[in-house]
């Protein structure tokens, strides 16, 4: 089978190209060569956090891999015979659990299996695990995919130590997703957590988010407050709007010197901003859905076309040909439809 060749510096030019490329290699059985990996970044090449996703997909598919070392700017991935497995990913730092799952979920959807990942559950520059559980999986369930994620322990920067387990059922009935504009909001949900911190931190984050959301919408607000223990302190909040179509989300992380009230308001404001265009899909979910839309079909309207989304469309089309139509400019609301 001929090898797919991907320029890793294209578009957003980050780790997402790697995650999507290797996941699609597993799904399609096509080997892939990725060059110029993170070429435009201050520290080019593979970083430790990228290795975890690649090695998890290697294990899932029995692949042969060349160039899988930190600093490498070229990776070759030759998928083997994929079968359902229990995948363990021990990230010894606060490396993102959810970025590993962004690589693992699309591939596992076609195979089934279970996973156990340690690392950072709520860390900068990646979706919080509660967003993945309550927003991403909610959308994937509408597409016929059944998956579960359970948080056993939180992990924050810099110590990590979080533990997430879950399973994915083989995706047998693929349902096209048509998610254009929402008409009404049924409720706001959320989870405010504080780890190795006083209980009032979670309460104050939740209270500030409730107050902010209620200024704009008169609907029920259910934000759960969670207090837990782990290797190090940290806090955060994820809020979502459950609409008549999908859920849209917003989130924020606490940090030393940042008042809990500011954290709660930040998450609420991010969600409120996503709601202004009435698009059914928020800007974070849009790019996550692209690999699944490729196989299920459908059309979505996103609150914002992002570089991540455009890049993910490009990567998918290197494997499957021209199947997407993207309408709208980066930074603006827009539509993504499957035409192939």
Swiss-Prot record:
PROSITE patterns noted in UniProt: RTC
The coiled-coil segments of this chain are none
InterPro entries for the chain: RNA3'-term_phos_cycl_insert, RNA3'_phos_cyclase_dom, RNA3'_phos_cyclase_dom_sf, RNA3'_term_phos_cyc, RNA3'_term_phos_cyc_type_1, RNA3'_term_phos_cycl-like_CS, RNA3'P_cycl/enolpyr_Trfase_a/b, RPTC_insert
EC number in record: 6.5.1.4
Q: Which reaction does it catalyse?
A: a 3'-end 3'-phospho-ribonucleotide-RNA + ATP = a 3'-end 2',3'-cyclophospho-ribonucleotide-RNA + AMP + diphosphate
Q: Member of which family?
A: Belongs to the RNA 3'-terminal cyclase family. Type 1 subfamily.
Q: From the Swiss-Prot or TrEMBL record, give the protein name.
A: RNA 3'-terminal phosphate cyclase
Which organism's genome codes for this protein? Thermococcus onnurineus (strain NA1)
Per UniProt, what is the name of the gene that codes for the protein in this document? rtcA
